Amino acid sequence: MKLKSLALAASACSLLVALPAQAQTEIQWWHSMSGQLGEWVNGLAKGFNDSQKDYKVVPVFKGTYPESFAAAIAAFRAGNAPHILQVFEVGTASMMASKGAIIPVTEVMKTGGVKFDPSVYVPAVAGYYTAPNGQMLSLPFNSSTTVFHYNKDAFKAAGLDPDKPPTTWPEVARAAASLKIAGHKCPFTTSWQSWTQLESFSAWHNVEFATKNNGFNGLDTRLAVDTPLHVRHIQNLANMAQQGLFVYKGRNNSADATFVSGECAMTTGSSALYGAVKRNSKFTGGISTLPY
């Protein structure tokens, strides 16, 4: 978000609270940006704060996305919710179902006098943040996608082509076998399992993840992850785990650190991991599309 947009959006949000006249309006911005992205968020807020005297944005790191989301829900119920909350995309649907919890971003922009055109966003991204009636509810910010990360140095050492990452799941299994023979105790892992191995897996194969337009068209939806394709995929991962080719490293993004450190040679996760790899890893990392 540009600083001007942030200023006007903050101005609109500040209408929700009663503050003394002439007082500087403080805007609480809860987020889940850690590391380099956290530094960027702090810099973004500082740049805006230094540009004017009427508003002060206070960025507050609240932990992982689930932790931030839970904290925001608790704060809302207690009557002291933050003005701005940055969480993962799936938070939009939950907030959409919670009447009165949020003000749609289109309304915030309109109140603030900001020209706002949701159509400028990539449709696949905008869909995450938009209600069935076409109204954008939340603002795409630092959106990421699921990708395949791999250690090019480990590939070379295992006799694999570092410029040809596996593009299919059978190829992932074969690459993992070569990495295991080369001495890797964790050839392949994954973070955000439900996102990478179910939701994105479904989209990549053009199959349904949940009924009712992925839940946007009604609360009586159900997950559709018990199809033969999904069952076969999870069984293949289980088989790889039994062979020591796939190693589970915990929930959410716990596996990310094991890839950055070089412990695990391949992983599926967020494209946001790229920054940590470039900054902290002692190996050359590669990125490719999800396997199919």
What are these regions (language model features)?
Residues E26-L44, K62-Y65, S144, T196:
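Extracytoplasmic "Venus flytrap"
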Residues P132-F141, T146, K156, P170-R222, ...:
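Extracytoplasmic/periplasmic solute-binding protein
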Residues G43, G47-Y121, A157-G159, T258, ...:
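Extracytoplasmic "Venus flytrap"/periplasmic binding protein-like
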Residues Q24-G35, Y55-V60, I84, L137:
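Short, well-ordered beta-strand elements
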Residues A173-L179, F216-K249:
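Glycine-centered hinge/linker elements that transmit conformational signals in sensory
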Residues T106-Y121, P165-T167, V207-R232, R279-N280, ...:
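Short, solvent-exposed loop/beta-turn-alpha elements that line the ligand-binding surface or hinge
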Residues F88-V147, A173, E199-A203:
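Hinge/lid segment of periplasmic solute-binding proteins
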Residues S32, S200, H205-V207, V231-Y292:
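Extracytoplasmic/periplasmic substrate-binding proteins
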